[in-house]
A protein has these predicted regions:
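A short SAM/SAH-binding and catalytic strip from SAM-dependent methyltransferases
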Residues: 92-104
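Short hydrophobic/aromatic beta-strand or adjacent loop that forms the aromatic wall/cage
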Residues: 177-182
């Protein structure tokens, strides 16, 4: 299993009430199955531990890779292209690590994934950014089968167009690390027509973080350096870059319902930056990761 994938999984592991609320897990582009096996064998932190026994689906179009997925009774192997409907159920959590970049039409793929999820289900994406600046030089890499370059801003656009809640969301893109990690909920807003949907339309839909809205209304487009999002470790992060003198937007403190503790208190925390310097500020620190959990399934 990739180290960064395990790190994200272990961060999710800390949220017991959220894990209790899940029943069906779908891994889109599962490869040889390390990640879906983690889900299939996950146990509670009780003493003694109790298996969650999630209903797991491993989706991949490569039969050779699927053959390496462990034969566990709660993993159903599905040899299908994830660009079409792949599973006969609605997911409570959809996991897509290192896979979306292989879609030739990622906007349509995200729409198809949305259709296979319950409202308030979570989509967890980890996807590499194949261009950027390193050592003061622009670089670009193109791998076989990858026709699109993803950025944090383009992902927010694609996800919100497809009805994913990018207001009550979690994102991390670290400096000098190509991986973009984002966890979003499926909202009750239907996917929109990507050809005609503007940023202003998405503002009206209520699916955007306040720092995203501020950037769009100030410049007419979204600037990466303006974005501030929490991550699963309960810290708040700028995306990839932050200037030496940082002012935290007052609007970053918004009264959302996306955390377990709905009675959040303003707490002192450290805003993570690309460089070792940090800024002490008072902002609303995420207490939990998830919305109040759904009732347990029978």
């Amino acid at each position: 299993m990739a180290r960064h994938a395990l790190k994200v999984l272990n961060q999710l592991r800390e949220y017991d009430s959220f894990l209790d609320s899940l029943k069906t897990i779908v891994d889109m582009g599962c490869g040889t199955g390390e990640d879906i096996t983690w889900w299939a064998t996950l146990e509670t932190r009780d003493d003694p531990p109790v298996p969650y026994n999630y209903n797991c689906f491993a989706v991949d179009r490569d039969p050779a890779k699927l053959a390496q997925v462990p034969d566990l009774k709660n993993i159903q192997k599905t040899e299908k292209d994830f660009n079409i409907r792949s599973v006969p159920v609605q997911a409570d959590l959809m996991w897509a690590h290192d896979s979306l970049q292989y879609s030739t039409n990622p906007i349509e793929t995200l729409k198809v994934w949305n259709e296979q999820m319950n409202v308030d289900a979570m989509l967890v994406l980890s996807i590499p950014q194949h261009s950027g600046v390193a050592d003061n030089r622009y670089y670009s890499r193109t791998h076989s089968g990858c026709f699109h370059n993803f950025t944090p801003t383009s992902l927010i656009y694609m996800l919100a167009v497809n009805g994913f809640d990018c207001k009550d969301a979690y994102m991390l893109k670290e400096f000098n690390d190509p991986w973009i990690h984002i966890a979003v909920y499926k909202s009750d807003v239907a996917p929109k027509d990507a050809d005609t949907t503007s940023w202003l339309d998405l503002i009206d839909s209520g699916l955007l973080n306040q720092t995203v809205i501020n950037s769009i209304t100030s410049y007419g487009y979204l600037r990466q350096e303006d974005i501030l999002y929490p991550w699963l470790d309960k810290e708040n992060y700028f995306i990839d870059y932050v200037s030496q003198q940082t002012v935290i937007p007052a609007e970053a403190v918004h009264n959302d319902t996306g955390v377990v503790n709905t009675k959040k208190q303003a707490k002192k925390t450290t805003v993570k930056q690309a460089k070792p310097t940090s800024v002490e500020t008072t902002i609303a620190k995420p207490i939990g990761v998830m919305r109040p959990p759904k009732k347990k399934y029978d």
